[in-house]
A protein has these predicted regions:
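PRPP-associated nucleotide enzymes
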Residues: 1-172
């Protein structure tokens, strides 16, 4: 199993704020598009800071049980979830939590540029993430943390995947 990089909420929000500063100084997107689930909290914070409309694309990667450091085939949802107008998709900032193998951002850009309702409005797609792993072949446009290794990044809410609702009820 890969080494682990454990991130708490304070560290996480500081990294998102650094990403917001990078974006503010270097790009003027018209919409933020988050890759779910990893980008959900990032998009929430960035949209409040940058005052931009948001959209979500849902992608699932299947690699099999017990394969923490492997990525499988990607499956895209049929639609984008957004209240943004089609015209807002002029300058897209596509956001994920991390750049690992590079498969997700590459395939997401391709999918987004071919998505029927907005494809004619998209003039530019740039990318952002919080972490870029050393072995990633994808180079995001904005990334506050570039790692020298390829750790498994344990994000602040990840522990909930290991808890049952019964355990949470007992704690509360």
């Amino acid at each position: 199993m890969a080494e682990k990089l454990i991130i708490n909420f304070d560290e996480y929000t500081k990294i998102v704020e650094k990403l917001a500063i990078q974006i503010h100084k270097n790009y003027n997107p018209t919409v933020l598009v988050g890759i779910m689930r990893g980008a959900a909290p990032i998009i929430d914070i960035l949209s409040r800071i940058l005052k931009l409309p948001i959209a979500y694309i849902v992608i699932q990667s299947y690699s099999g049980k017990g394969m923490e450091d492997k990525q499988g085939q990607l499956m895209f949802a049929r639609e984008i979830s957004s209240l943004a107008n089609n015209e807002d998709f002029n300058k897209v900032l596509l956001i994920d939590d991390l750049s690992d193998t590079g498969l997700t951002p590459n395939k997401s850009i391709e999918w987004l540029k071919n998505y029927g309702p907005t494809k004619d409005y998209i003039k530019e797609v740039k990318t952002a993430c919080l972490w870029k792993k050393k072995s990633s072949t994808f180079e995001p446009d904005f990334c506050p943390v570039r790692l020298d290794t390829d750790p498994w990044i344990v994000q602040p809410t990840e522990h909930y995947e290991e808890l049952s609702i019964e355990e949470i009820i007992k704690r509360n």
